A protein has these predicted regions:
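Conserved anion-binding
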Residues: 1-111
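Conserved alpha/beta-domain cores
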Residues: 109-114, 149
Length: 151
């Protein structure tokens, strides 16, 4: 099933209003948000929330505790944003299984099997680019690997 996601970095209320008019299923939000703000955004704009937590060190993984009751999906991402920086994906094991986990941050085909066992969702956008442009060869290889893992 395909879901449409708007990726927003520290969006203003006006930006959220504009994006809420699009046929998006989720707002993927980067920034410092607490439960109160997430509840407000969900109620006002009728969107599910993927909240991104930037990972610089192992203790950053635990920041999910602040938003686990309101964010629909917790995304653990590198602190590099669009730079596709890796982090120790095993750190996510400290998060409970009852939350929907998403991982991003320099995920390439060689890491897919390991990551698929740690997270429910994998964000691979930067890993499938060459010079900041989607690379059809990388996408094809990635999809072949996904099919192999699912067979």
């Amino acid at each position: 099933e395909t879901k449409f996601v708007g990726v927003l970095v520290n969006p203003s209320d006006e930006e959220l209003k504009v994006y809420s008019r699009l046929n998006l299923d989720y707002f993927q939000i980067y920034g410092n948000y607490d439960n109160k703000k997430i509840i407000e955004i969900k109620a006002k704009y009728k969107k599910k929330i993927i909240l991104s937590l930037q990972i610089k060190n192992k203790k950053d993984i635990l920041n999910y505790k602040n938003v686990k009751d309101t964010a629909d999906i917790i995304l653990w991402d590198s602190s590099g944003l669009e730079q596709s920086v890796s982090w120790e994906y095993d750190w996510i094991k400290s998060a409970p299984d009852n939350i929907t986990k998403m991982i991003a941050g320099n995920i390439d085909i060689d890491k897919l099997e390991i990551i698929s066992k740690l997270a429910d969702i994998v964000d691979v956008s930067g890993a499938l680019e060459t010079d900041k442009v989607k690379d059809l060869y990388k996408i094809k290889k990635f999809l072949e690997k996904v099919k192999e893992l699912n067979d």
